[in-house]
Structures are given as C-alpha cells and as structure tokens.
UniProtKB/Swiss-Prot annotation:
Residues 527-536 have a biased composition (Acidic residues). It comes from Culex quinquefasciatus. Probable transcription factor with a role in the retinal determination (RD) network. Contributes to differentiation of antenna-specific characteristics. Residues 21-72 form the HTH psq-type domain. Pfam families: CENP-B_N (PF04218). Its main location: nucleus. Keywords: Developmental protein, DNA-binding, Nucleus, Phosphoprotein, Transcription, Transcription regulation. It is found in: Nucleus. GO terms for cellular component: nucleus. This is Protein distal antenna.
Length: 662
C-alpha cells in the first residue's frame, strides 16, 4: 500500500532528526583541571578512546586537549588559585570577576569589552597571577584576607605571618593620613622589634615605587597604590632573598643575616626625621631618638636628601648620632633595589652573618682600609673627599662582615657614598695610627707618575724617580762625592771625538764609579731604612747601580747622532776595590767603550742585558711602595729595547766582517 505524501514527509523528517542526532553526546562543561586529569590518564597508559568514552567527549576533542596541554595547565593553575575565593565568596560580583578573568585569558580577538563596574574588586586578582609554589606567598590582595604566609608554604628568611594588607590603601587614604599626621609616614611603629606584622604599615614605606605607574597597564592608583602587582613585588623580593642566601652567586656572604621579616620596610618612628638614616639592628629599631617637638622638620626623601644633609651637618657635629635611630625605610627600600640591580648587595649588608665572628672595633691595616673603616664620630657624610685618596675596588669575597657595633655606628648613605664618591676617610679621631699608616702607604703605592716627575728636583732621588725617568737620554756620571759632573757644568760637547783605544787602561774607572761610593751617595736614600741589611744586599745594590749607569749610557749612545765624549770625573781612592775586597768590575767600562765605538761587541751588550735582567728580577721582588708597577713595566720595555738594539748591532757587525773577508 503506497504511503501518502504527508506520511512520507513525517517519516523523512523523523529520519533526518535521527540521523542528525545520531552519535552526538550531550555536551559537558569540563574545567581545566578535569581536562588536565584526562591528559594525565593518557600519559599513565590509558588509550584516548577509553578516556574519551569515560568522560563523555569525542576522541578528537581529547586529542586537541593533548596538543594544548601547556595552556590547559596554565588555566588550571589560575583556577586553583581562585578556588578559595570562589568557595568563600559565592556572590554575583565574585562570579562576574571570575568570568572576566576567563575572558582576559582568551585570545585578544575574543575578549569582551566590559564596563568598569565589573572591576569593583582588586584588578590584580585576575590579571597578575604567579604560581604559589614559586614564592610561598599569597599576596593577591583579597578584601578581607590577610596577605601573609599560609601554613604549608615555604617560610622564607624568617618571614612568619607578615601582614601586608595595609599596603592596599588607596592614594586618597594615604594623603588623608599624611595630612592628619603632619608628616609623611610619621607614626608608623611604636612597639619596636621591626616586625611588619606588628607595625602599622602604609604606602609611605615604599614611596619611591609610586613613581612607577607608567610601567603598568592600569589607569590610575585607585586599584593598586603601587600601580604594580603585589605578587610581582613579592616574587622579586623572594628572588633577591634567595640570591642573598646563595653562597655560590658572587660570594654574597654578608646578606645571610638580612631577614625578610624586616622586609626592607622597617617603619620609621616618631623622631628626628632629618637625622641621617642608619642601618639598625632589629632589637634597636624600637623607640626612636629625637625630641617630639621637631615635627616642623621636613621629611627625608630622595629629592631633598642633599639639602637635609647640609642643613644638619652642624647639628650632627655637636650632638652626635643616636645609635638607636632606625633607618628611613623609604630610602632604604629604594637603595636595596638599586644595590640588587647593580650587584652590590655584599657591600651593604644590614646585619652580619650569625656564623661570622665578632671582629674588633679597630680595623686591621689592610689595603682596603679606606673602604672598610667605619666612621665612629659625628663626621657628616657630605664631607669633601680628599683628592689624593684613590678608591680601590674591593672584591666581594674579601669584604669583612660588619659587626653589630659597626652597623649601629654607620649609615647606609655613608657606605653608598664612600664607594661611589671616592674614599671619605677624613682622618678624624676614629682613625687609629695603623689605619692612617695603611692609608699613607696605599696613597704612595698609587702615586701619580706625572706628579713624581714634576717634583723630582724638589726631593732626594729615589728608585722610583730613577726608574720613571730612565728613558731620558742623560749620561749620569757620578763622582766619588756623589755629585753629578756634567749636568751642573756646561752642556756636553758632542762634536769632539775620543778614540777608545788611546785611553790608558787605568782610566777605565771614569766610566764606572766605585760601587761603594755609589752606595753612599745615591743608594742610601733609596734602599729600605732597616739598619740590619746584609752586606750581600748592599753589594747587590752597588752592582745594580753600576748596571743602571751602563744601561743609561747605552741608551744615550744609541740616541745620540755621533760618538760620545764623556766628561772626565775625578777618581776616588776606593774606586778600584769593593767594600768586601773584590775588584771593581772593569768589563762594564769596556762594555761602555765598545758600545760607544763603531765595533760593537756582542759580549759587552749581552753582559749589560744580563745584569739588567738580574736587576729587573730584584726590582720585581722589591717591596718598596715608591716603586710602582708602571715604572717596572717601563724598565722592562727599556731592557727589551736595549736587547733588540744589541742584536741588531751584532748583526750589522757580522755583516761588516763578512764583507771584509770577501
């Protein structure tokens, strides 16, 4: 029986509906955590088909989840962070904020344009999130939730239950509080101890960061007074603290005692706000010094710091410094951030390491005395640095840890300015004799070479001066009484020629003065003033003097255009013998004669270079502070030049001999 048209149409429609819905499963709303659990089941060995049937999603969808596993894990972490808020705050505003968070985490083209009314809660709840496992802090800024350390999280640097919820005040509250208290951050901590959990903290403690609003995408300060996420700040502080505790990173040995309980934000009490900030111990940061009647004093900020230092220098000279005055934490927080960026944390530790021994108050005389000596009197930090003092870079491993007494009697500004503004030790009553002697020795060690050349004629000749001027073409002939002969008379006549073969053998000593007289006339002010020097050292010094004269004559003979006529010098009675009975080394005079002549002998030049190398070895082992490294290098270059010149002259003499033989 044929089917009617209406019956056929109904059957066709039903068939189409059955075909359209066949194989379709009801859609299930699965969270990111459920998707991650399904992916983990696949990693554990289950097949994609069985997992897809179990959770009720197509297998192709499950394969897409596996491809986007990293994105799903990120969303799962965010949902885990918001789980506590979603369970405790099941209001419409909270649900709207969570929906807004999901929209913001999507692609840019799928984001909704939401009204400002949806953001009644803190903006950085949903926008700036960091995993809790990384820093152990939950500083998400909830309305009634304390920003502290949860029970099972990591306790970092002794930060037990610190409450930072007071930082979440708006700019209007801060300004109102500042007007009520007549000073910026005046009444912050009365109970001492330096514990932020017990103190009333405000944004004044980190006021330098309020100028960083251009770094954030937020429109104004109504959402966060810092214009930054508290999670970001906490993460950065924890990273800095972990670097401080790591002994392998730049040997930052002085920062282990710096606890995050102080959080770089110990509050400033009522007191003299114009006093210089000082790094104080936790047990001494309680009741501040100063009188309560100085509320008219301007606050100590970064901008007017120099004015306040100049204004209070006389007051600090008269009254001294209060050892119990805590540090101005606004500047201290800014300073620590600068030090962290520059890698200078080890120079400005707030407390010594617990394992470091207590060092005595008087600093031992080392080469770093000018930087490690702490000011014990009331010298203002803005004193003019001495010009002659040369700052030395102190290696981090050699910086001694500060004792509590040194920490109480020194301010962070002094340490900062001492490092970057040259050495500021004015030599006051606090500097003992050892530190003054070490400073003088250090200054003489780094003495300016140009200054030593300019003042050479005003001081007795020293080894440093003679070495520094060894490149000058001067033929120094020293007589028996220690007087330079031809320098005091008229200039030497270079036109006359003297034949070395016509000189009698007994006149060789005019080129080589006696070593004994040279020691008495020239080397006595140069050598160390210890009277118990051995005779062997004196003999070596005498030989070195003779070698230096030969080297000077060699240099002068090479730089002069013609043969050299030496000025006669009177013979001393002891010029033929040495102090210990040895004969005067006459080959040195022969060397000089052969060098001045055209027939240069290799033996004479080589012997002079050999003596010069011996003198160089002695000079490198010399511990005289007047001998600088630059002068030793100059002598090395001079000796090398003489050696090369002798080789060239020897090569020329051999060529002339070959030509004569041919």
């Amino acid at each position: 029986m044929p089917m009617s048209s209406s019956g056929y149409s109904r059957t066709t429609t039903h068939f189409k509906m059955m075909m359209a819905t066949k194989g379709k499963r009801p859609l299930r709303h699965l969270t990111a955590t459920d998707k991650i659990d399904a992916i983990q089941r696949i990693h554990d060995g289950e097949s994609k088909a069985s997992v897809a049937r179990d959770i009720g999603v197509p297998e192709s969808t499950l394969r897409g989840w596996c491809k986007n596993e990293e994105k799903l894990r990120y969303m799962s972490r965010q949902s885990a962070e918001n789980a506590d808020k979603l369970t405790s705050e099941a209001t419409a505003a909270a649900l709207t904020a969570v929906a807004a968070a999901e929209l913001f985490n999507g692609p840019p083209e799928k984001r909704m344009k939401l009204e400002q009314g949806l953001f009644g809660k803190k903006y950085d709840e949903s926008f700036y999130k960091s995993p809790r496992g990384m820093n152990g802090l939950d500083l998400s800024g909830g309305g009634d939730k304390g920003l502290g350390v949860s029970g099972g999280d990591i306790i970092m640097n002794g930060l037990h239950g610190a409450d930072f919820s007071a930082f979440a005040k708006t700019a209007a509250e801060i300004s109102a509080m500042g007007k009520a208290k007549d000073r910026y951050g005046a009444d912050l901590s009365r109970n001492g101890g330096g514990d932020p959990g017990k103190a009333e903290l405000s944004m004044a403690a980190i006021s330098p960061l309020t100028s960083l609003s251009h770094l954030s995408g937020m429109g104004g300060l109504a959402q966060s007074p810092l214009a930054l996420s508290f999670n970001e700040i906490a993460t950065n502080l924890n990273l800095i603290a972990q670097l401080n505790n790591n002994h392998n990173l730049a040997t930052m040995s002085n920062l282990g005692g710096l606890t995050a309980a102080q959080s770089l934000r110990n509050a400033r009490p009522k007191g003299n706000a114009s006093q210089s900030p000082r790094a104080s111990l936790p047990d001494s940061s309680g009741s501040g010094g100063g009188t309560p009647g100085d509320k008219s004093t301007p606050s100590l900020t970064v901008r007017n710091l120099a004015k306040l230092q100049q204004k209070t220098s006389s007051e600090l000279q008269n009254n001294g410094r209060d050892p119990n005055a805590p540090v101005d934490e606004a500047l201290w927080y800014w300073l620590k951030s600068q030090q962290a960026m520059l890698g200078l944390n080890n120079l400005y530790s707030q407390m010594p390491r617990p394992s470091s021994p207590q060092q005595p108050q008087s600093t031992p005389p080392t080469t770093t005395t000018t930087q490690q000596q702490q000011p014990q009197s009331s010298t203002p930090p803005t004193a003019t640095p001495p010009i002659v003092s040369t700052p030395q870079p102190t290696p981090p491993s050699s910086a001694p840890s500060l004792t509590p007494e040194d920490t109480k009697n020194s301010s962070w500004f002094w340490q900062w300015y001492k490092t970057f503004g040259a050495s500021l030790m004015p030599g006051d009553k606090s500097c003992n004799n050892n530190s003054i002697n070490a400073t003088n020795a250090n200054n003489s060690k780094y003495e300016n070479i140009l200054y030593s050349q300019l003042t050479k004629g005003q001081s007795p000749p020293t080894t440093a001066d003679s070495l520094n001027n060894n490149a000058q073409p001067i033929n120094l002939n020293i007589s028996s009484n220690g007087v330079v002969d031809h320098l005091k008379s008229e200039p030497e006549d270079l036109t006359t020629t003297t034949n070395p073969s016509m000189l009698p053998p007994e006149d060789h000593t005019r080129f080589n003065p006696s070593p004994s007289t040279s020691i008495k006339s020239e080397l006595k002010p140069e050598v160390d003033e210890d009277e118990d020097e051995d005779d062997e050292v004196a003999k070596c010094n005498g030989a070195n003097t003779a070698v230096k004269q030969v080297l000077d004559n060699l240099l002068y003979s090479q730089s002069s255009p013609g043969p050299v006529a030496t000025a006669p010098s009177p013979l001393s009675p002891s010029s033929s013998t040495h102090e210990n009975g040895h004969a005067t080394p006459t080959p040195l005079a022969d060397d000089l004669k052969s060098t001045c002549s055209e027939d240069t002998d290799l033996k004479s030049s080589a012997e002079a270079v050999e003596h010069g190398e011996k003198f160089l070895k002695w000079l490198e082992a010399c511990s005289d502070p007047n001998v600088t490294a630059m002068q030793v290098m100059q002598f090395k270059y001079l000796l090398n030049s003489i050696k090369l010149s002798a080789e060239r002259q020897n090569g020329g003499g051999e060529e002339r001999t070959r030509r004569r033989r041919k």
